[in-house]
Amino acid sequence: MKSKLIVVSFIWLVILFVFAAAWKLWWVPSQEEAVEQAAQEAHEEAIRQTGSASKYRTQINFAYDSFSGYSIFRSENFKNNLSQKSLKVNLVDDGANYIERLKGLQSGKYQMAAFTIDALIKASDEIGDLPATIVEIIDESRGCDAMTGYKLAIPDLDALNDPEVKFILIENSPAETLSRVVMSHFGLNNVSEKSFIPVANAEEVYRRYRESKPSDKFVFVLWEPYVTKMLENPNVHDLVNSSRFRGYIVDVIVASRDFLVKDEQAVRDFIEAYLSSVYHYRNTMESLVASDAKEAGTPLNDEQIKRLVKGIWWKNTVENYAHMGVESHSLQHIEDMIANITKVLISTGSISSDPANGQPNILYYNKILSDIKNNNFFPGKENLRTESDVLPSLNDEEWSKLTPVGTLKVPKIVFARGTSKVTSQSEITLNELVEKLKTWPQYYLVIKGDASLRGDIEANKALALERAKSVERYLLNHGISSTRVKAVAVEPTGSTDVMFQLGYLPY
């Protein structure tokens, strides 16, 4: 009996201990926490009641980087325009990490961002998703980016077709895009991914140049102001720069598709504010870029600023309407830009497949620009700047003095046996050549007919010339200006190919 009493007492002691522990460890803290929470809520309510409504309707986290072409985003005028539209924009410099930038749009960390079109395509392929869409064009590189090399080691683009040539550049940058455009369009079968030497930043590319020798087969792919610095060396020349082609190095504003669906008005207000600032700075971009560079701790001299501004084509309102297909004009449509860039990235192995599955139209959204145009949004009187595809005509002596740039990569043109008649299959090839030539409007084209060494050499040369002229006629009939094309027969080498060499008239 006594032992049972001891057991029962022990059990009750355990129960009391458990209740005491629960009271001390759970109930008391929970009550204290509830009191603290109530006090915190009361404090927050007091703050709300004694504050004011925010002047900002929406906040946008905008991801970008320090590129000089983005200086308008950092300007006071843009901030003021946003404020007038009750928009608060937080600019986030991510150091040009495009993959993380797109992931940020995907997750909701960012609502809008700046991209180059090629970087958007590559990043979309990398993450396997299309979380962002293009809503406006910022600018196009028109000479700001260039490929330089020593004249002795690399006299022209054809000399790049050498496995010993190395491209010193920054990965996932406009420099890489420029290199891939050249790889895609010229006969550079010996250039591969192993030819690329990626470095961390522009300063490292420039350092590699400073340490190189005139005999080195290095190509330095960079942008201003470094290009100007390298070209001060008389042994270095500009192999090609972005003023020679169009539609490949293009900066755009993108919006998260999720944010666009939820708050299209905010995206519209952002675009209107930006385009108004483009108009505001239309005559003072040099001053803006200079102050922007100084603020960033990288001041530029007057010559560097002039070349930098000259090399960037900031797109105004009417140019955006044209590029985005809101109104008809000769400016290149953004859908064609996207398709051309995708083709370059695939053909050079930068991406394995098209993330848009052959539908470039799903990568841009032109409804906002269409709506603001229909509502007569024009910040001021702006000109739609165009570039003529018509080069000045040359006489025979001038044609003979053209500086060769390189030989275009074109599949073999096939003719009916023993004639100059182009086959239907090769007409498809020539149609593609027409489109390619439209993206290189600043170069003349020499069509070179080669001939067999067998049989009657003179007859072979005559056929080679007639074949070159037949190709010339086809190009002219499909929109290529007669002033930029010349058909010739070269001294026979045994081949019966027709070759296409670009060139320019030296100053």
List where the protein language model places each region:
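Short, glycine-/small- and polar/acidic-enriched structural segments
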Residues: 28-202, 218-224, 247
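Ligand-binding clefts/hinges and TM-proximal coupling segments of bilobed small-molecule sensing domains
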Residues: 36-39, 167-194, 273-311, 358
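Periplasmic OmpA-like peptidoglycan-binding domain that tethers envelope proteins to the cell wall
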Residues: 450-507
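Sec-exported extracytoplasmic/periplasmic mature domains
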Residues: 75-78, 106-107, 125, 152, ...
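Hydrophobic membrane-insertion alpha-helices, especially the h-region
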Residues: 8-23
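Secondary-structure end/capping motifs
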Residues: 263-353
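Pocket-lining segment of extracytoplasmic ligand-binding domains
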Residues: 117-119, 193-301
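Periplasmic peptidoglycan-binding/tethering modules of Gram-negative envelope proteins
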Residues: 369-444, 501-507
